[in-house]
Amino acid sequence: WTSCKIGFRSIEIKNREMLINGMPVLIQGVNRHEHDPVSGKTVSRESMLEDIVLMKKYNFNAVRCAHYPNDPHWYELCDEYGIYVVDEANIETHHYYGRLCREPEWTNAFLDRTRRMVETNKNHPSIIMWSLGNESGYGPNHAACAGWIRERDSSRLLHYEGALRPEFQGDWKPDAGFNSFATDVVAPMYPTINDIVEWVKTSKDKRPLIMCEYSHAMGNSNGSLSDYWDAILNNHGLQGGFIWDWVDQGLDPEGNEKWKYGGDFGDKPNDANFCINGLVWPNRKPHPAMYEFKKLVQPVHADAIDLEMGKLELFNRRYFTALEDIFLEWRLEIDGSTVQKGTIKTLKANPRNKMQIRLNLKKPEVLIGQEVYLYLCY
């Protein structure tokens, strides 16, 4: 036996929303592989903490453990710092996508990995969903795992993308209630924006839609992030998702910031650059999409009421915390030069509430053709 910290929270589905402690928290998530550029899959506690601090800094609030249970320290840190976790069983059968899950001789192997995940990590309140695995089709073996989890732990939700897409590379099934025994959320992988908006309009499914994977971050990508989040913020039933994925999995054993992958060690066969699809470099330096995501989901949203009078309306997007810990710095620029600036040190808006502020803004002298911008920094 060993001691561990515990916590209390409630998770339930009501009216197309996943409620955490009664609030429909948007999932601002990312998929994360365990990876260190020097030690590979052996990740230190310090490296894990670096990831969590960076995620919090860029407004991520959730992680899917893709595609296996993580080091025990990871869950302890998520409990402490406030990251929601989808814990995933170490089940993935790409080439045999719809086969192993339907063969009785594999049932115990499926159940063993599922039980081990739940029994090992059940005391961590940061875990809000158990995932039955990744891209493994759907069959009786998944149903057995789902049944065991529902009997063992009714305090959390079930998540499994494969229950909505039983055929490899097939279309996901948006039918109301399709395979709802195996997943409490509609969790498609790489749906188009039109797909998810049409689902809102046409499906009678009472579950929320939380994308299992979207906005694949390989190469020059993530180009539709703002369009996805416009859809999420404006359609009841869409509750966020998990970007694929967190870190480029390059290796730098010599410490010279030349990351190797996909044949650089003379390894054949290899997957070329298919492990280089992260939002951050192997050394955790952010790619440009990180800055865009941070802006899209920032905890304060501003609307102009009367710019000449300096009147703005702020909306606190947080679900459990007021704005007293945040101050506002603003500046007015004309053609890139700051002409006015100021600070509002006290913001008072309860969770999911609005407030009005007035900037000490004087009407500037603007010549024809000049560009004027008001910048807000929280």
Q: What positions do the PLM features span?
A:
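Buried hydrophobic-core signal for structured, non-transmembrane domains
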Residues: 311-318, 374-378
